[in-house]
Amino acid sequence: MTTLLTTSDVANIVALQGPRKVFTDLLDYVLADFLRWQEFDKCARVASHSATGVIELMPTADNELYSFKFVNGHPDNPQAGLSTVMAFGALAQVSTGEPLLISELTLTTALRTAVTSALAARALARPDSRTMALIGNGAQAEFQALAFHYVLGIDTLHVYD
């Protein structure tokens, strides 16, 4: 049976578990996958460019699961009431091809991107760091600030946009 995960579902998970748990648990999953990076069958993203934007397909797999992310970038979309970036993806069983999950990946990617940055900072920053600079305050900035707060204890932000 294929599960459908919507943006509302992801938001509800964050609300129910709380952002601290979501960010710290997600960091553990991201780290576990980085540690087994060589096990993944990776290829370069496939991009389809047009005069109005780009659509990219990003596949990856290991011996058990195949997944892809479909993401667009269309800068003029807000003029039509659409998001500049929208993403969805699928997860399937390699042995049978059975689709296990169809998921929104716009909000999920924002969470994962922030956690990946916090993971890198955890490895590179001084352990006593409590201040962060954010240059650019677009859609991703809030997720970055939250991940750095919950994962690294950042309590002071300097922002510039």
Predicted regions and their residues:
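NAD(P)-binding Rossmann-fold cofactor-contacting core
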Residues: 151-161
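N-terminal Rossmann-fold NAD(P) dinucleotide-binding loop
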Residues: 141-142
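Active-site-adjacent beta-strand anchor residues
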Residues: 103, 134, 160
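N-terminal ligand-binding/catalytic initiation module
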Residues: 1-109, 116-118, 125-128
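Alpha-helical transmembrane segments of multi-pass small-molecule/ion transporters
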Residues: 117, 132, 157-158
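Short helix-loop-beta connector
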Residues: 124-131, 153
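Glycine-rich Rossmann-fold phosphate-binding loop(s) that bind the pyrophosphate
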Residues: 137-138
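Gly/Ala-rich phosphate-binding loop of Rossmann-like dinucleotide-binding domains
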Residues: 145, 149-150
